[in-house]
Amino acid sequence: MPQFRDPNEKRDFMLNTPIPRLVPKMALPSIAGMLVTSAYNLADTLFVSQLGTDATGAVGVNGSIDLIIMMAGSLLAVGAASLTSRLLGAKQDERAREVLSTCFFLALALGTLVLILGFTYQNKILLLLGANEEILPYSEQYCRYILLAAPFMATSFVLNQCLRAEGSAVFSMIGMVAGAVLNVGLDPLFIFTFGWGVAGASAATAISKLVSWCILMTPYFRKKTLLTIRFRQFRPRWSDAKEICAMGSASFFRNGLGTLAGILLNRIAVGYGTSALAAINVANRITMFMTSACLGFGQGFQPVAGFSWGAKRFDRVRESFRFSMIACVAGISAVALVVGIFARPILLLFTEDDAELVRIGVFSLRIQCLAMPFHGFGIIVNMLCSGIGRALPSLLLGLARQGICFFPILPLMVRLWGVWGIASVQGAADMLVMLLAVPIAVRVSRDIRRREAEQGGEISPV
């Protein structure tokens, strides 16, 4: 994707490039970055699985730590991205820079708070997340280095989202890919060559996150972006805070509910044995590879919608939504079909002698593959609402997948089908999300058409 120094050139690119060319140009770097990141998470699990089922379960438990850190950054990151893209579209560049700087330093503070609390209450937190006596020692080793990286991880979310928001998706991709490739290279070195075991996997991840953060900061230091990060631009405003929290709350609660859902699944699954716990987490890691593709496409579409909405180009909002919906749902359906067919060979990569892990994992993975088209639809509708500043629909969809549609059916499915209910609950929840996503999509689409028919009536761009 071309890079621009002149703000007017970038606006022209965002507002006049044909949608079938613009959305893929914006989405492909995001998809690549998200897929590579998911791949190294998967590789991390694959390498650790060579240490045994207990170690694999420990990595699954610590996945909730990652989500807690993500919560710290996503509230600010998603809200800042939505607001800055609309501000840039409306040519309010200086205010957009102040929004980014404010959110960056607040995310740094939140990440530091997670680090301090995590080390202070480490054992209690890990037990709460679902660790048992068998996997607690591994969980403690893995948790240590991840917590040290928390401030960099939290601020990386802000950097990533705001780079995409201004159309600089390539910079975002480079940072994510470089960190992922480094992690895959360091994992076998630290785990096996140095003999550090689970702690080696954690150290590799922490170092990779730090390197990724440095790369994401580079375009801001070299002034290759429309936005800048300066402490003198740290200017909290109540009006901006309300807007950022309103838009970021969807991601915040989604990650919060994802953390809670993961904790509940871990605590219930461990009652059926360590193999069941490991199977659920391995299947979820593989599924994350597919959901990341959906999310990456949505993150490419969101700034297109935001820029167009801020510039009152409602025809482009409508066209980009339609194009993105068709492309995302069709693409993820094809990928899910392939993964579902080869589910068993994929699970066998993670264990050679644990038949129970493979049996439960294959079932869970195939159920989630069936639900992928529904998930893709929900992601695009959510990104549309986020991009154009529709906080309430965005929040509802953010709460749906691992909240509104998840928690009510979890106890019922566990009661009826035991471990098989646990294995299929996420797929069932994804299907139920459609009950919210379809009416929201219809209502928002009607409003876009109305504004388009009125030739962009008087509205606030932010």
Question: Where in this protein do the model-derived segments appear?
Answer:
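Small-residue-rich hydrophobic transmembrane alpha-helices
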Residues: 56-116, 153-172, 266, 279-343, ...
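Hydrophobic transmembrane alpha-helices of multi-pass small-molecule transporters
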Residues: 68-71, 183-188, 213-217, 289-292, ...
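Helix-terminus/linker motif at the lipid-water interface of multi-pass membrane proteins
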Residues: 35, 39-57, 126-133, 189-196, ...
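Transmembrane helical elements of multi-pass membrane transporters/channels
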Residues: 25-44, 145, 179, 208-212, ...
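Hydrophobic residues within alpha-helical transmembrane segments
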Residues: 28, 32, 62-68, 105-109, ...
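Short alpha-helical transmembrane segments in multi-pass integral membrane proteins
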Residues: 1-27, 84-151, 193-249, 305-371, ...
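Interfacial/gating helices of multi-pass transporter permease domains
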Residues: 48-67, 134-138, 198-201, 240-247, ...
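Short runs within selected transmembrane alpha-helices of multi-pass transporters and secretion channels
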Residues: 77, 146-164, 172-180, 201-214, ...
